Amino acid sequence: MKRLFAVFAVALLSVSPESSWRNGGESAMNGAAKFGTHDYIALKGYELAGITNLPWITSNLNVYFLGTEAPDVGPKIDGVEDGYHDTGACHCILFNAAGGVTRPRAETRVREEFNKAKQAKANGDNRKAAFYAGAMAHYLGDLSQFCHIMGPQSHWNSEDPKVHTSYEEVVDKTMDFTTHKSSLFDSFIHSVTVTGNTPEQIARGTAAFTEKGDGTERPGLMHAQYKALKEAGKQNDPGQWDAALRNQTGENVNYSANAIAKLLKMI
């Protein structure tokens, strides 16, 4: 019985309790970055910020993309301390029904990575600055995913893990890994006003945008609609999604990309 319990405990520990937007697979150490949803959101943030304003990223764009993987799989460049691969700690900001924050974890991580990027850039180490900026973009990107606004400490309660994983897999399939375009998101990307003047405020505002659903589809509604699509076998084609679900998915990602752009210009 003790042996069985030990095996069961190990199995539980080996399962990640939370998913994230995809990165197109795991890149090799110091290799060319694979491209997925996280890279797309980070790229759009970079573009919205104005490429000519960010030469320190332009000359280290591959490292910037590798940075977007770190919170899920750990750092993929030499010379960077660990402390990533932290999905179990929740890439989330959770709210109660009154709008108060009950769990600010992603807010904290955005600030930490922003500060590291700013310090590295001040030290003349643009390579590390780009990496940390990519990691920062990861946490902001996750806040555009409605399941990252759900959890036992939120008024929505926990999401269905199968819905969480399926939604992210379907979205990632809209990415063209060669052209870096998305058949789902491209039409939604445009400049919008982002609230807040500090990393913490900007991260919280990004989560609040997803939480409030821009006045339409809130996390609980998006979860219920996607779950119904999944049960009907219609989840794999965003063209078959309810227009409100599809549009809110795009608007959430667009706001996140704009939040990244604002912070990149502040580094």
Segments (PLM) and residue ranges:
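Sec-dependent N-terminal signal peptides
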Residues: 4-12
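C-terminal segment of classical bacterial N-terminal signal peptides
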Residues: 14-18
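N-terminal, motif-rich segments that launch catalysis or mediate targeting to/interaction with membranes
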Residues: 19-131, 146-267
